[in-house]
Amino acid sequence: MRDIARGWRVDGSTIGLVPTMGALHAGHMSLVEAARRENDRVVVSVFVNPIQFGPGEDLARYPRSAERDLSMLRGAGVDAIYKPSAADMYPAGASTRVVVHGVADSLEGAARPGHFEGVATVVTKLLTATSADRAYFGQKDAQQVAVVQRLAADLDLGVEIRVCPTVREDDGLALSSRNAYLSGPERMAAVCLSRALGHAAEAYGRGERNPDRLRAILRKAIESEPLAQLEYAEVVDPATFSTPGSIAVLAVRIGKTRLIDNRDLRLPYPG
């Protein structure tokens, strides 16, 4: 990958990177489309990163659809598909990890210890391997976006972090590779996340700014769904993930499947 990127650099081409873990869906492809519009060359990485999964998480059963992914990416006209192995990324003896403090400590960072250390490490390695000018992430993973933005700024990586809107199903459910785990009833129940965010956005649009009341609105909507178990509901600053703020964020278990979603409450409702 480095040799390919060097050749593009010699030609004066700009490079866009779309990091993925595979199991691609329309949300990923929207990132690819944005990268194609804004760069001469587009690289999509497909790598299920083992060090961002904790004990008991779904590394072994994470959805994988290699042939389908390759077909989608070829059809989208990407210039390179980067599929390193775990041994390529973390050879024997590798002991360096990238740790982002502050923004990575709360919510997802607290619920999944070591997760953002794994994310920050793999993103740094992917950016280095591809010499990307721009890297594309979805707003659905809002805290990951904030962590990567902090990483890029603090390490002077010279890469622009581009954030693209969350892509949703017609009923509001945010697209996620983990949606494949949901049974029929669970899939119907999962709409409670976007419904809760909509209720909070509606209240915010009417002038509600009290974080306790906004959190209560989120909790009530989730707790009204029998199949849902709330892990957290918070309203945070989009850059620091401290409170108070203007981004409503949720983590909810629907059956055994853990889903996250968020919404910028400053956007008009509906929006």
Residue ranges, per PLM feature:
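Nucleotidyltransferase catalytic core that binds NTPs
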Residues: M1-L227, V236, T240, K256, ...
